[in-house]
Amino acid sequence: MTVLVTGATGFIGAHVVMELLSRGIAVRAMMRDVQLAEMFPESDLLEVVKADLFDIDSLRSAVQGCEDVIHCAATLYVRARDIQKEVVDPSIIGTENLCSVMQDVKRIIHTSSVAAIRPTKYQNGQVLSDEDWCDDATVSTNGYGLAKAEAEKRMRAWAEEKDIRLITIHPSVVFGPLLHKRHAEGSMSYLKHFVQGPPFVLDIHINFVDVRDVAIAHVNALELGRDRQRYILHKHGMWMNEIGRELTSMMGKKYTSRKLNKPLAYLVALLHPKLSIKRLRASLGKHVDYDVKDAFLVLQLPNYEMKTTLKDAVVSLEEYL
């Protein structure tokens, strides 16, 4: 059995590849830049293939002979300037293209996100579950939520009348050890802030989960869990200043926990290339929570402790940066 992993060089995808290899499972790691395969150890079980979600011929070749697909490919929202072109289209059109060549696939695990569950306009303190959908997103208001929700819908519609096992995994923000310096971007940029960012934090709440739990969930879901189920993976929620205090307590050195007030936060957003007042206004001082139900139990996950996740993530960041 060979498992195709799309987005194999991404943070989640790379950990999925490593988890499969650790179990002696043959992996076909799909990536656009094969030079990034250097992050993986040499192994007779690892086959590296160059393919692109917009190139159907390359996808067809990548899928050929694989009955199991773990679809992790995604675009980093934090670096995108053209949300439609760089985030929405790769997620939706890329998923449609992949579906078009998976005639012989029997099991697919699709990496979604809590972004596909959390509405753009949510109530402060709202608890969301796998029954919720991000149905109010647009490219301008919530491009990432739109991309994740619509890609999942496309995948589910494609699988609806097929004899195929489909499970979608919905992690919150993913923290944990890096496997390559490029993993310091994306979700880990929140913790990167504490390692080399300014001496203040914004009043933002972060829901997070360990990348190792997420990777194991993807692999275990090939066998475990209910077909067509959406599994939310979320461990803990903390305000940024709480994370700073926790790191200071654990690591034996000072990490920033000074919180900016709203006027200063909006000024920072105005000047920061990756922030906007619109995006900040939607999240500043607000939070949601997630009901993971029996996801960790059913998928038999280690359930890493919050302190372990934060410590391992920051130690790894400091090694790579």
Q: What residue spans do the PLM features occupy?
A:
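N-terminal Rossmann NAD(P)H-binding glycine-rich loop of SDR-like oxidoreductase domains
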Residues: V3-I25
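Conserved C-terminal active-site "lid" loop/helix of NAD(P)H-dependent oxidoreductases
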Residues: A269-P302
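Conserved Rossmann-fold NAD(P)-dependent oxidoreductase catalytic core, especially the SDR/UDP-sugar
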Residues: R81-N142
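Active-site Tyr-X1-5-Lys
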Residues: T138-L166
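Mid/C-terminal beta-alpha module of Rossmann-like enzyme folds, strongest
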Residues: A217-I277, K307-L321
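Glycine/proline-rich active-site loop of Rossmann-fold NAD(P)-dependent oxidoreductases
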Residues: E161-I164, G176-M188, A221-Y231
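NAD(P)H-binding glycine-rich loop region in Rossmannoid oxidoreductase-like domains
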Residues: V34-L36, P41-I93
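A conserved pocket-lining segment of Rossmann-fold NAD(P)-dependent short-chain dehydrogenase/reductase
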Residues: A80-R81, D135-S140, H180-K181, S187-V209, ...
